[in-house]
């Protein structure tokens, strides 16, 4: 994996994923509750997020240069048109490389809103304190950090950006989600 410039992780649960055979990048399907598919299987908790965090901590030392995380749907309201067309577009890499946040770009078209109403839930659940605070400190120093960011967890991220945090961060996030999420 480490030699790949781009690698796609498709989070799969129950949809038709035949479209994946048409994407130009190497890819792997990430399953839910399929022990025979290990290491590409995660508990059915927290939707695609457990797939993302499990992949990042398990493959931390051999990550591709850039990882593209997508959901199982070729067509969905949160991305424009066909995911095949989006991933195969000659504009995808220039879009990613020109992102305001180096090493990260959302490929969704729906922006997030204000985080402020969600902060009490993040604190009450223990999520921020147990997973984020050791690395980022007090949540209130970040102001409105979600406003207009791409929603729905489909994105491209560089190995360098992932490794700006230790492997333990991703493992802790995965474990917290598995222990504290209702099956999805």
Map each language-model feature to its residues.
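ER/Golgi luminal nucleotide-sugar-dependent glycosyltransferases, focusing on the catalytic module
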Residues: 1-184
């Amino acid at each position: 994996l480490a030699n790949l410039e781009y690698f796609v992780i498709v989070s799969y649960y129950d949809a038709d994923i035949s479209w994946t055979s048409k994407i130009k990048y190497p890819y792997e399907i990430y399953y839910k509750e399929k022990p025979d598919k290990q290491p590409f299987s995660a508990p059915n908790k927290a939707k695609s997020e457990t797939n993302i965090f499990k992949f990042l901590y398990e493959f931390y030392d051999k990550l591709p240069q850039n990882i593209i995380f997508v959901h199982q749907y070729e067509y969905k309201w949160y991305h424009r048109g066909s995911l095949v067309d989006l991933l195969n577009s000659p504009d995808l890499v220039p879009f990613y490389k020109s992102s305001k946040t180096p090493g990260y770009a959302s490929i969704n078209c729906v922006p997030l809103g204000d985080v402020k109403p969600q902060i009490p839930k993040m604190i009450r659940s223990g999520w921020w304190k147990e997973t984020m605070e050791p690395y980022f400190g007090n949540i209130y120093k970040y102001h409105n950090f979600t406003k207009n960011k791409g929603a729905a967890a489909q994105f491209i991220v560089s190995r360098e950006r992932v490794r700006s945090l230790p492997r333990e961060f991703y493992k802790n996030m995965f474990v917290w989600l598995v222990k504290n999420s209702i099956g999805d």
